Regions:
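A structural signal for short, hydrophobic/glycine-enriched beta-strand patches
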Residues: 172-329
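Extended hydrophobic blocks
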Residues: 2-188, 278-344
Length: 344
């Protein structure tokens, strides 16, 4: 009897410790998301979709662990519970340290992303996958599944990941594009921000960059915007994206005084951060139109919501084939899900 009581106390202590670690992981992730984007945690908003996802999956895990402790027909496996918990926490710590320490890496690019960014996404995604694995394992255990438990947990975790990507894919169709006629009639001094895109050999704008810049040119000529803000840095050995776009606009007859240029940002996140710090906070500009390709607009809006800035979006006239459209939307779905969960 005494031994049984000790076992119960030990299980409760371990369960409590695991729940505390899961809560600390969640808090740590929230702090990282805002700190990494140079935002104060005071900007935290639980209604933000990504923050809500973080909370929901952590709560599911906590509830399952609590049920696992009290469900008498389930064998309490301390080693497995601690193994999952430690794996999650260590991967999260490693991912955050990788971002903070900035270890020197070769200047390689994988799927249009630097090696550093690619590793960063892999590390944080590994944390999330282990969390899904933990959730699946506990859920199946509570359902008294015994055969191929780990295999089924892996399959379920992959299924959860795919469902989230499908949800992100569907969300790409939910972007609200600005009503240009309404903006023109209000006669506000809007600034059109062109997000950078690839530069092709001989410092030529890629179709995406040219199309975005053409749309800014069109809006300026129609009087919908008063200034064009170009953004985008550069890869080694080429002009920055914004410089190429600047040259492109000058050749089309736009006056230099109508163009602002930024040459350091290297991602959509950095460009939205630039909009917040430079245009909204430093220049006190509130009327902003962000110009990009149609498949990109939803992620822009989600990032702006995270940064708590109000913008309007306009799609470029870029035309892509069905295969390229699926490729771009799939890539954007992954990027959107990664931003939701980790603000990367």
């Amino acid at each position: 009897m005494l031994r049984a009581n000790r076992d119960i106390k030990s299980k409760r202590l371990i369960t409590s410790a695991i729940i505390v670690v899961i809560i600390l992981d969640l808090i740590s992730l929230y702090f990282f998301k805002y700190k990494n984007q140079h935002l104060s945690i005071s900007n935290f908003d639980l209604s933000n979709k990504g923050n809500l996802f973080n909370l929901i999956f952590s709560l599911i895990l906590i509830v399952e662990i609590f049920l696992y402790l009290h469900y008498k027909k389930t064998k309490y496996q301390t080693g497995i519970l601690l193994g999952f918990t430690l794996s999650m926490t260590l991967i999260l710590i490693l991912a955050q340290l990788f971002v903070v320490i900035k270890i020197p890496l070769p200047n390689y690019y994988i799927l249009d992303h630097s090696l550093r960014d690619f590793i960063k996404v892999i590390l944080f995604s590994s944390f999330q996958f282990v969390q899904f694995l933990f959730i699946s394992y506990l859920g199946l255990s509570l359902l008294r599944t015994k055969e191929l438990l780990f295999t089924r947990s892996i399959v379920n975790s992959i299924a959860i990941s795919i469902l989230l990507l499908i949800y992100a894919f569907i969300n790409l169709y939910g972007s609200k594009v600005a009503d240009l006629n309404e903006i023109k009639n209000k006669k506000n001094n809007y600034v059109g921000v062109v997000l950078g895109a690839a530069v092709w050999p001989k410092n030529m704008p890629s179709p995406s960059l040219a199309s975005r810049t053409d749309k800014a040119y069109e809006l300026l000529k129609k009087g919908i915007i008063k200034k064009i803000q170009l953004t985008g840095g550069h890869a080694p050995g080429e002009m920055s994206e914004s410089e190429v776009a600047y040259k492109y606009l000058i050749n089309k007859g736009i006056k230099p005084d109508d163009i602002w240029i930024e040459k350091r940002t290297a991602s959509t996140n950095e460009q939205i951060r630039f909009i917040k710090s430079n245009l909204v906070e430093n220049k006190n500009i509130r009327n902003i139109i962000v110009i990009s390709d149609s498949y990109h607009l939803k992620r822009i809006q989600e990032i702006c919501n995270f940064f708590n800035i109000q913008i309007k979006v306009v799609a470029s006239d870029l035309s892509v084939g069905s295969e390229n459209r699926i490729y771009h939307k799939t890539k954007e779905s992954i990027a959107l899900a990664v931003f939701w969960f980790f603000a990367l």
